[in-house]
Amino acid sequence: MKINNSLLNFVNGMLVTLPSSKTLTLSWNFGSMLGMVLIFQILTGTFLAFYYTPDSLMAFSTVQYIMYEVNFGWVFRIFHFNGASLFFIFLYLHIFKGLFFMSYRLKKVWMSGLTIYLLVMMEAFMGYVLVWAQMSFWAAVVITSLLSVIPIWGPTIVTWIWSGFGVTGATLKFFFVLHFLLPWAILVIVLGHLIFLHSTGSTSSLYCHGDYDKVCFSPEYLGKDAYNIVIWLLFIVLSLIYPFNLGDAEMFIEADPMMSPVHIVPEWYFLFAYAILRAIPNKVLGVIALLMSIVTFYFFALVNNYTSCLTKLNKFLVFMFIISSTILSWLGQCTVEDPFTILSPLFSFIYFGLAYLMLFIFMSSKLLFK
Protein backbone atom coordinates (compact mmCIF):
# COMPACT_ATOMS: atom_id res chain seq x y z
CA MET A 1 0.00 0.00 0.00
CA LYS A 2 1.70 3.20 -1.24
CA ILE A 3 1.04 6.41 0.71
CA ASN A 4 2.36 9.81 -0.39
CA ASN A 5 2.10 11.52 3.01
CA SER A 6 5.45 10.97 4.80
CA LEU A 7 3.94 10.77 8.30
CA LEU A 8 1.22 8.32 7.26
CA ASN A 9 3.80 6.36 5.31
CA PHE A 10 5.92 6.08 8.48
CA VAL A 11 2.92 4.82 10.50
CA ASN A 12 1.98 2.47 7.66
CA GLY A 13 5.51 1.04 7.70
CA MET A 14 5.27 0.47 11.46
CA LEU A 15 1.80 -1.09 11.65
CA VAL A 16 0.82 -2.46 8.24
CA THR A 17 3.63 -3.27 5.82
CA LEU A 18 6.29 -4.07 8.44
CA PRO A 19 8.02 -7.34 7.35
CA SER A 20 7.50 -9.82 10.20
CA SER A 21 8.69 -13.37 10.62
CA LYS A 22 6.08 -16.11 10.34
CA THR A 23 7.40 -17.69 13.55
CA LEU A 24 6.56 -14.83 15.95
CA THR A 25 4.66 -15.85 19.08
CA LEU A 26 2.44 -13.92 21.49
CA SER A 27 5.54 -12.84 23.43
CA TRP A 28 6.30 -10.41 20.60
CA ASN A 29 3.15 -8.55 21.58
CA PHE A 30 4.63 -7.26 24.86
CA GLY A 31 6.23 -4.26 23.15
CA SER A 32 2.99 -3.00 21.60
CA MET A 33 1.23 -3.51 24.93
CA LEU A 34 3.92 -1.42 26.63
CA GLY A 35 3.30 1.38 24.14
CA MET A 36 -0.43 1.37 24.89
CA VAL A 37 0.12 1.36 28.66
CA LEU A 38 2.63 4.23 28.35
CA ILE A 39 0.08 6.39 26.50
CA PHE A 40 -2.57 5.36 29.06
CA GLN A 41 -0.30 6.43 31.94
CA ILE A 42 0.48 9.78 30.33
CA LEU A 43 -3.24 10.53 29.82
CA THR A 44 -4.32 9.52 33.34
CA GLY A 45 -1.29 11.24 34.87
CA THR A 46 -2.06 14.49 33.03
CA PHE A 47 -5.61 14.44 34.43
CA LEU A 48 -4.29 13.91 37.97
CA ALA A 49 -1.78 16.76 37.52
CA PHE A 50 -4.70 19.17 36.98
CA TYR A 51 -5.73 18.78 40.62
CA TYR A 52 -2.46 17.91 42.36
CA THR A 53 -0.57 20.51 44.42
CA PRO A 54 3.16 19.84 44.93
CA ASP A 55 3.34 21.30 48.43
CA SER A 56 4.46 19.42 51.54
CA LEU A 57 1.44 20.70 53.50
CA MET A 58 -1.16 20.03 50.79
CA ALA A 59 0.12 17.11 48.67
CA PHE A 60 -1.42 14.33 50.74
CA SER A 61 -4.73 16.18 51.14
CA THR A 62 -4.95 16.93 47.39
CA VAL A 63 -4.60 13.20 46.68
CA GLN A 64 -7.56 12.63 49.01
CA TYR A 65 -9.40 15.49 47.32
CA ILE A 66 -8.93 13.80 43.94
CA MET A 67 -10.23 10.53 45.39
CA TYR A 68 -13.34 11.93 47.10
CA GLU A 69 -14.27 15.28 45.53
CA VAL A 70 -13.26 15.25 41.84
CA ASN A 71 -15.74 13.61 39.47
CA PHE A 72 -14.31 10.17 38.61
CA GLY A 73 -11.04 11.24 40.21
CA TRP A 74 -10.88 7.95 42.10
CA VAL A 75 -11.06 6.07 38.78
CA PHE A 76 -8.11 7.97 37.33
CA ARG A 77 -6.09 7.58 40.55
CA ILE A 78 -6.70 3.83 40.78
CA PHE A 79 -6.01 3.25 37.08
CA HIS A 80 -2.84 5.35 37.18
CA PHE A 81 -1.63 3.56 40.32
CA ASN A 82 -2.28 0.06 38.96
CA GLY A 83 -1.24 1.07 35.44
CA ALA A 84 2.33 1.43 36.73
CA SER A 85 2.25 -2.20 37.89
CA LEU A 86 0.76 -3.32 34.57
CA PHE A 87 3.52 -1.45 32.75
CA PHE A 88 6.27 -3.11 34.80
CA ILE A 89 4.70 -6.56 34.39
CA PHE A 90 4.94 -6.28 30.61
CA LEU A 91 8.31 -4.52 30.84
CA TYR A 92 9.85 -7.44 32.73
CA LEU A 93 8.19 -9.93 30.39
CA HIS A 94 9.62 -7.95 27.46
CA ILE A 95 13.13 -7.99 28.97
CA PHE A 96 13.02 -11.69 29.81
CA LYS A 97 11.77 -12.43 26.29
CA GLY A 98 14.73 -10.47 24.95
CA LEU A 99 17.13 -12.56 27.03
CA PHE A 100 15.35 -15.78 26.09
CA PHE A 101 15.60 -15.10 22.35
CA MET A 102 18.97 -13.29 22.52
CA SER A 103 17.59 -9.99 21.27
CA TYR A 104 20.71 -8.24 22.58
CA ARG A 105 22.36 -9.08 19.26
CA LEU A 106 20.44 -6.07 17.93
CA LYS A 107 22.73 -3.67 19.76
CA LYS A 108 20.97 -0.32 19.23
CA VAL A 109 17.57 -1.81 20.04
CA TRP A 110 18.89 -3.45 23.22
CA MET A 111 20.77 -0.36 24.46
CA SER A 112 17.84 2.00 23.83
CA GLY A 113 15.47 -0.46 25.52
CA LEU A 114 17.61 -0.64 28.67
CA THR A 115 17.82 3.16 28.73
CA ILE A 116 14.02 3.29 28.63
CA TYR A 117 13.93 0.83 31.53
CA LEU A 118 16.24 3.00 33.66
CA LEU A 119 14.22 6.15 32.91
CA VAL A 120 10.94 4.37 33.69
CA MET A 121 12.33 3.27 37.06
CA MET A 122 13.23 6.90 37.84
CA GLU A 123 9.80 8.01 36.69
CA ALA A 124 7.99 5.43 38.84
CA PHE A 125 10.07 6.32 41.91
CA MET A 126 9.27 10.03 41.60
CA GLY A 127 5.57 9.28 41.13
CA TYR A 128 5.69 7.10 44.25
CA VAL A 129 7.07 10.04 46.26
CA LEU A 130 4.37 12.47 45.06
CA VAL A 131 1.71 10.85 47.27
CA TRP A 132 3.72 12.27 50.23
CA ALA A 133 2.66 9.41 52.47
CA GLN A 134 4.72 7.91 55.27
CA MET A 135 6.29 5.14 53.20
CA SER A 136 6.96 7.24 50.10
CA PHE A 137 8.52 10.08 52.12
CA TRP A 138 11.00 7.81 53.87
CA ALA A 139 11.71 5.93 50.65
CA ALA A 140 12.70 9.28 49.13
CA VAL A 141 15.00 9.98 52.09
CA VAL A 142 16.69 6.58 51.86
CA ILE A 143 17.07 6.34 48.07
CA THR A 144 18.23 9.91 47.43
CA SER A 145 20.78 9.68 50.26
CA LEU A 146 22.43 6.80 48.38
CA LEU A 147 23.80 9.37 45.92
CA SER A 148 26.10 10.59 48.69
CA VAL A 149 28.47 7.69 47.87
CA ILE A 150 29.50 9.46 44.64
CA PRO A 151 33.10 10.62 45.21
CA ILE A 152 33.61 14.36 45.86
CA TRP A 153 30.28 15.55 44.42
CA GLY A 154 27.93 13.10 46.20
CA PRO A 155 26.88 15.21 49.23
CA THR A 156 26.49 18.29 47.01
CA ILE A 157 24.22 16.39 44.59
CA VAL A 158 22.06 15.13 47.48
CA THR A 159 21.73 18.66 48.90
CA TRP A 160 20.83 19.96 45.44
CA ILE A 161 18.10 17.33 44.94
CA TRP A 162 16.73 17.95 48.43
CA SER A 163 16.98 21.73 47.89
CA GLY A 164 18.20 21.91 51.46
CA PHE A 165 19.40 19.63 54.22
CA GLY A 166 16.45 17.27 54.13
CA VAL A 167 13.50 16.11 52.02
CA THR A 168 11.10 19.07 52.03
CA GLY A 169 8.41 20.71 49.93
CA ALA A 170 11.06 21.98 47.52
CA THR A 171 12.10 18.36 46.92
CA LEU A 172 8.48 17.51 46.20
CA LYS A 173 8.21 20.28 43.59
CA PHE A 174 11.47 19.09 42.01
CA PHE A 175 10.13 15.53 41.72
CA PHE A 176 6.74 16.69 40.42
CA VAL A 177 8.27 18.71 37.57
CA LEU A 178 10.57 15.83 36.58
CA HIS A 179 7.72 13.32 36.88
CA PHE A 180 5.65 15.46 34.49
CA LEU A 181 8.43 16.07 31.94
CA LEU A 182 10.28 12.74 31.89
CA PRO A 183 7.53 10.76 30.05
CA TRP A 184 8.04 12.99 27.00
CA ALA A 185 11.74 12.14 26.97
CA ILE A 186 10.79 8.47 27.32
CA LEU A 187 8.45 8.81 24.32
CA VAL A 188 11.31 10.18 22.20
CA ILE A 189 13.58 7.27 23.15
CA VAL A 190 10.71 4.82 22.51
CA LEU A 191 10.41 6.29 19.01
CA GLY A 192 14.15 5.75 18.50
CA HIS A 193 13.75 2.21 19.86
CA LEU A 194 11.07 1.51 17.23
CA ILE A 195 13.13 3.03 14.43
CA PHE A 196 16.18 0.92 15.37
CA LEU A 197 14.01 -2.20 15.61
CA HIS A 198 12.19 -1.74 12.31
CA SER A 199 15.31 -0.76 10.39
CA THR A 200 16.72 -4.28 10.91
CA GLY A 201 13.68 -6.35 11.84
CA SER A 202 13.33 -8.19 15.12
CA THR A 203 14.67 -11.60 16.02
CA SER A 204 12.28 -14.54 15.89
CA SER A 205 11.59 -17.71 17.85
CA LEU A 206 14.02 -19.42 15.45
CA TYR A 207 16.84 -17.14 16.73
CA CYS A 208 17.33 -15.40 13.40
CA HIS A 209 16.56 -11.91 12.13
CA GLY A 210 17.23 -12.12 8.42
CA ASP A 211 14.66 -11.53 5.69
CA TYR A 212 13.61 -15.17 5.55
CA ASP A 213 10.01 -16.14 4.94
CA LYS A 214 8.35 -12.94 6.18
CA VAL A 215 4.82 -11.56 5.93
CA CYS A 216 3.28 -8.11 6.39
CA PHE A 217 2.41 -7.25 9.99
CA SER A 218 -1.20 -6.50 9.06
CA PRO A 219 -3.57 -8.30 9.01
CA GLU A 220 -1.66 -11.43 10.11
CA TYR A 221 -0.42 -10.12 13.46
CA LEU A 222 -2.69 -7.12 13.95
CA GLY A 223 -5.60 -9.55 14.32
CA LYS A 224 -3.67 -11.77 16.72
CA ASP A 225 -2.91 -8.75 18.92
CA ALA A 226 -6.63 -8.41 19.61
CA TYR A 227 -6.11 -10.44 22.78
CA ASN A 228 -4.89 -7.15 24.28
CA ILE A 229 -8.57 -6.34 24.74
CA VAL A 230 -8.82 -9.23 27.20
CA ILE A 231 -5.78 -7.92 29.10
CA TRP A 232 -7.33 -4.46 29.37
CA LEU A 233 -10.66 -5.86 30.55
CA LEU A 234 -8.88 -7.91 33.24
CA PHE A 235 -6.91 -4.83 34.26
CA ILE A 236 -10.07 -2.74 34.64
CA VAL A 237 -11.93 -5.42 36.60
CA LEU A 238 -9.03 -6.23 38.94
CA SER A 239 -8.27 -2.53 39.49
CA LEU A 240 -11.86 -1.86 40.53
CA ILE A 241 -12.16 -4.93 42.77
CA TYR A 242 -8.67 -4.80 44.31
CA PRO A 243 -7.62 -1.15 43.87
CA PHE A 244 -4.74 -0.95 46.37
CA ASN A 245 -3.68 -4.55 46.89
CA LEU A 246 -0.31 -3.82 45.27
CA GLY A 247 0.31 -0.87 47.60
CA ASP A 248 1.39 -0.58 51.22
CA ALA A 249 -0.80 0.32 54.20
CA GLU A 250 1.69 3.07 55.15
CA MET A 251 0.71 4.87 51.93
CA PHE A 252 -2.57 5.88 53.63
CA ILE A 253 -0.74 7.72 56.43
CA GLU A 254 0.48 11.28 55.86
CA ALA A 255 4.25 11.77 55.88
CA ASP A 256 5.78 12.41 59.30
CA PRO A 257 9.45 13.49 59.18
CA MET A 258 9.79 12.78 62.92
CA MET A 259 8.83 9.09 62.79
CA SER A 260 9.99 6.49 60.27
CA PRO A 261 8.06 3.30 59.41
CA VAL A 262 9.10 0.09 61.14
CA HIS A 263 9.99 -1.51 57.81
CA ILE A 264 10.67 0.54 54.66
CA VAL A 265 9.55 -1.32 51.53
CA PRO A 266 9.49 0.09 47.97
CA GLU A 267 6.97 -0.86 45.30
CA TRP A 268 7.09 -4.49 44.15
CA TYR A 269 8.87 -3.72 40.87
CA PHE A 270 11.92 -2.38 42.76
CA LEU A 271 12.14 -5.21 45.29
CA PHE A 272 14.79 -7.34 43.53
CA ALA A 273 17.19 -4.37 43.39
CA TYR A 274 16.32 -3.37 46.96
CA ALA A 275 17.13 -6.91 48.16
CA ILE A 276 20.54 -6.71 46.45
CA LEU A 277 21.17 -3.31 48.08
CA ARG A 278 20.34 -4.67 51.55
CA ALA A 279 22.36 -7.85 51.02
CA ILE A 280 25.66 -5.95 51.23
CA PRO A 281 26.41 -4.30 54.59
CA ASN A 282 28.79 -1.74 53.04
CA LYS A 283 26.94 1.34 51.67
CA VAL A 284 29.28 2.01 48.74
CA LEU A 285 29.44 -1.63 47.63
CA GLY A 286 25.68 -1.94 48.06
CA VAL A 287 25.01 1.01 45.75
CA ILE A 288 27.48 -0.36 43.19
CA ALA A 289 25.73 -3.76 43.30
CA LEU A 290 22.36 -2.00 42.94
CA LEU A 291 23.53 -0.21 39.79
CA MET A 292 25.24 -3.27 38.35
CA SER A 293 22.06 -5.33 38.76
CA ILE A 294 20.75 -3.36 35.76
CA VAL A 295 23.84 -1.89 34.06
CA THR A 296 25.28 -5.41 33.61
CA PHE A 297 22.80 -6.03 30.80
CA TYR A 298 24.32 -3.23 28.72
CA PHE A 299 27.36 -5.49 28.31
CA PHE A 300 25.19 -8.11 26.59
CA ALA A 301 25.32 -5.89 23.50
CA LEU A 302 28.96 -7.00 23.15
CA VAL A 303 27.79 -10.51 22.20
CA ASN A 304 28.28 -10.74 18.43
CA ASN A 305 29.51 -14.27 17.79
CA TYR A 306 26.49 -16.34 18.71
CA THR A 307 26.35 -20.02 17.81
CA SER A 308 23.12 -22.02 17.72
CA CYS A 309 24.73 -24.79 19.80
CA LEU A 310 23.83 -22.84 22.95
CA THR A 311 20.09 -22.22 22.56
CA LYS A 312 19.03 -24.87 25.09
CA LEU A 313 21.67 -23.76 27.58
CA ASN A 314 20.50 -20.17 27.13
CA LYS A 315 16.89 -21.12 27.85
CA PHE A 316 17.93 -22.96 31.02
CA LEU A 317 20.05 -20.06 32.28
CA VAL A 318 17.32 -17.51 31.57
CA PHE A 319 14.74 -19.61 33.44
CA MET A 320 17.13 -19.86 36.41
CA PHE A 321 17.69 -16.11 36.22
CA ILE A 322 13.93 -15.44 36.29
CA ILE A 323 13.55 -17.69 39.34
CA SER A 324 16.41 -15.97 41.18
CA SER A 325 14.95 -12.52 40.36
CA THR A 326 11.55 -13.60 41.69
CA ILE A 327 13.04 -14.94 44.93
CA LEU A 328 15.02 -11.71 45.36
CA SER A 329 11.79 -9.73 44.96
CA TRP A 330 10.22 -11.82 47.72
CA LEU A 331 13.26 -11.31 49.97
CA GLY A 332 13.13 -7.56 49.34
CA GLN A 333 9.79 -7.23 51.12
CA CYS A 334 10.83 -9.43 54.07
CA THR A 335 12.02 -7.97 57.36
CA VAL A 336 15.74 -7.68 58.12
CA GLU A 337 16.14 -10.83 60.21
CA ASP A 338 17.20 -14.45 59.87
CA PRO A 339 16.89 -16.38 57.62
CA PHE A 340 16.26 -13.54 55.12
CA THR A 341 19.58 -11.81 55.87
CA ILE A 342 21.33 -15.06 54.89
CA LEU A 343 19.25 -15.78 51.79
CA SER A 344 19.56 -12.27 50.30
CA PRO A 345 23.38 -12.40 49.79
CA LEU A 346 23.09 -15.98 48.51
CA PHE A 347 20.51 -15.19 45.83
CA SER A 348 22.26 -11.91 44.98
CA PHE A 349 25.36 -13.99 44.23
CA ILE A 350 23.25 -16.39 42.12
CA TYR A 351 21.67 -13.42 40.27
CA PHE A 352 25.03 -11.93 39.28
CA GLY A 353 26.57 -15.36 38.73
CA LEU A 354 23.91 -16.32 36.17
CA ALA A 355 24.08 -12.93 34.42
CA TYR A 356 27.86 -13.01 34.02
CA LEU A 357 27.83 -16.71 33.15
CA MET A 358 25.45 -16.01 30.26
CA LEU A 359 27.59 -13.08 29.18
CA PHE A 360 30.86 -15.04 29.31
CA ILE A 361 29.52 -18.16 27.57
CA PHE A 362 27.95 -16.31 24.64
CA MET A 363 30.89 -13.95 24.17
CA SER A 364 33.24 -16.94 23.92
CA SER A 365 30.83 -19.34 22.21
CA LYS A 366 32.71 -19.43 18.89
CA LEU A 367 35.92 -20.33 20.74
CA LEU A 368 34.16 -23.07 22.70
CA PHE A 369 32.57 -24.66 19.61
CA LYS A 370 35.23 -24.37 16.91
Swiss-Prot record:
Pfam families per the UniProt record, alphabetical: Cytochrom_B_C (PF00032), Cytochrome_B (PF00033)
- Per the entry, which co-factors are needed? heme b
Q: What is the free-text note on the cofactor?
A: Binds 2 heme b groups non-covalently.
Does the record's keyword annotation contain Iron? Answer: yes
User: What keywords were assigned to this record?
Assistant: Electron transport, Heme, Iron, Membrane, Metal-binding, Mitochondrion, Mitochondrion inner membrane, Respiratory chain, Transmembrane, Transmembrane helix, Transport, Ubiquinone
List positions binding a ubiquinone.
H198
Question: Where, in this chain's numbering, is heme b b562 bound?
Answer: H80, H179
Its function?
A: Component of the ubiquinol-cytochrome c reductase complex (complex III or cytochrome b-c1 complex) that is part of the mitochondrial respiratory chain. The b-c1 complex mediates electron transfer from ubiquinol to cytochrome c. Contributes to the generation of a proton gradient across the mitochondrial membrane that is then used for ATP synthesis.
Q: What else is known?
A: Heme 1 (or BL or b562) is low-potential and absorbs at about 562 nm, and heme 2 (or BH or b566) is high-potential and absorbs at about 566 nm.
Protein name per Swiss-Prot or TrEMBL: Cytochrome b
| UniProt gene name | ctb-1
